[in-house]
Regions:
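Extracellular, repeat-based ectodomains that mediate carbohydrate processing or recognition
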Residues: 1-177
Length: 177
C-alpha cells in the first residue's frame, strides 16, 4: 500500500527509553499503541499508551496503562476487540507474589479503562516470562472476548486463558503441550 503520511512520534514523554511498542487496529478505523517506558511511572518500567482516530490524529493524550507500579512492568502486546475497545497485556515483575506474571487492562471504545488491572495467569509459582521479551500474545474474538497466551518457564509449556466480552475469565487456564 501507499503511505498515508510521514513518520510520526508516538510518545510525548521522551526521557530515558520508550521501547517494545505494540499496535492494534480498532473497529472505528483508528488504532492504539502501547509501549514500555523507563522510570515514567516511578518504577523500573511502566506500560503507556496512545489512541489514534481513523485519520491518524492522536485521540487524547498519552496515558498510563498499568496501575501496579512496584518493580517493573514490561513488554506489552495488544488487540482490538469486537466492541471497538482494546485490551493490553504485559509482563509484571513480582506482582503475582512469585516472579514474573501476565497482567492486563481492558479499555472501551472511547479509551476508558473497564474494570481493574487483571492477572491472566492462574499458576503463579515461578516465571510466566521469557528473556526473549516476546512471551505473551492476545487476540480479540468475534464474541467480544479475548484469548491470552504466554510461555511458562516452569514446565517449558505454553499456557493461556480465555476471557468473556465482560472481561471475566471463562476458564481455569489452557495448557498447550
Amino acid at each position: 500500500g501507499n503511505s498515508l503520511g510521514g513518520e510520526f512520534q508516538v510518545t510525548t514523554y521522551t526521557t530515558e527509553d520508550q521501547a517494545y511498542p505494540s499496535v492494534a487496529a480498532l473497529a472505528d478505523g483508528g488504532f492504539a499503541v502501547s509501549w514500555s517506558s523507563t522510570y515514567q511511572d516511578g518504577s523500573d518500567y511502566g506500560i503507556f499508551g496512545q489512541r489514534y482516530d481513523s485519520s491518524g490524529d492522536a485521540a487524547g493524550g498519552e496515558f498510563q496503562i498499568n496501575t501496579h507500579t512496584s518493580q517493573g512492568q514490561y513488554v506489552s502486546t495488544m488487540s482490538g476487540l469486537a466492541d471497538g475497545g482494546f485490551v493490553v497485556i504485559w509482563n509484571s515483575d513480582g506482582q503475582d507474589s512469585s516472579s514474573y506474571g501476565i497482567f492486563g487492562q481492558r479499555y472501551d471504545a472511547n479509551g476508558n479503562p473497564t474494570g481493574s488491572e487483571f492477572r491472566a495467569n492462574t499458576y503463579t509459582s515461578g516465571i510466566q516470562f521469557n528473556e526473549s521479551y516476546v512471551t505473551e500474545n492476545v487476540a480479540g474474538l468475534a464474541d467480544g472476548g479475548f484469548v491470552v497466551i504466554w510461555h511458562d518457564e516452569n514446565g517449558r509449556d505454553s499456557s493461556g486463558s480465555r476471557w468473556s466480552g465482560r472481561g471475566r475469565c471463562g476458564c481455569l487456564g489452557i495448557l498447550i503441550e
